[in-house]
Amino acid sequence: MNSNVENLPPHIIRQVYKEVSTLTSDPPEGIKIIPNEEDITDVQVNIEGPEGTPYAGGIFRMKLILGKDFPAAPPKGYFLTKIFHPNVSTNGEICVNVLKKDWKAELGIRHVLLTIKCLLIHPNPESALNEEAGRLLLENYEEYASRARLMTEIHAQGSSLRGKDPTDPCSSASATLVSGDGPMAKKHAGDRDKKLAAKKKTDKKRALRRL
């Protein structure tokens, strides 16, 4: 893919270079920047799968591509590591609002990376690019988690990343998800219980009609 460096104004190039340098020396928790000195518009990072999620233990390579209209237009995000996730297509394209309708020119690369990391903790099935993953997340969380864990074990194994970021809005949230007891798992368990109760009630009414 061709570089967009020559298409960006000098002050934007300096701005991006400064932010990437800062992120490299002071990265958010669980995120490691892989700087490309030849093309700063190709920002590659490793993201550590958050604890308590089906992605825990995995290291996921992804990249942001800064187009010629950046920062007026959002960057494009792609996972280079295969991942089973509702908001990531089979070719790695990431669907998240901050890369689309919620983008603002003043939002930086750090904000985008933290948002994508949060997406690993809180998937959004309503804007699914992977329809199968979105359907399983809503209808059968255990199967969704099993598929996601398997993909992580096959494609995303690596050494853990170190680093703490007190501004990371996801760091405390991930701790509540351990062992499938987090809000996502509980929500889907509650939905299943309601469906089972409704089915039993319907079956009972049908049985009474036959008497």
Swiss-Prot record:
Which PANTHER family has this protein been placed in? UBIQUITIN-CONJUGATING ENZYME E2
Matching entries from CDD domains are given as:
UBCc_UBE2S (cd23804)
Q: What class of enzyme is it?
A: transferase
Name of the gene: ube2s
The protein's Enzyme Commission number: 2.3.2.23
Report the protein name in the record: Ubiquitin-conjugating enzyme E2 S
Q: Which organism is it from?
A: Xenopus tropicalis (Western clawed frog)
Entry keywords, A to Z: ATP-binding, Cell cycle, Cell division, Nucleotide-binding, Transferase, Ubl conjugation pathway
One Gene Ontology cellular component = anaphase-promoting complex
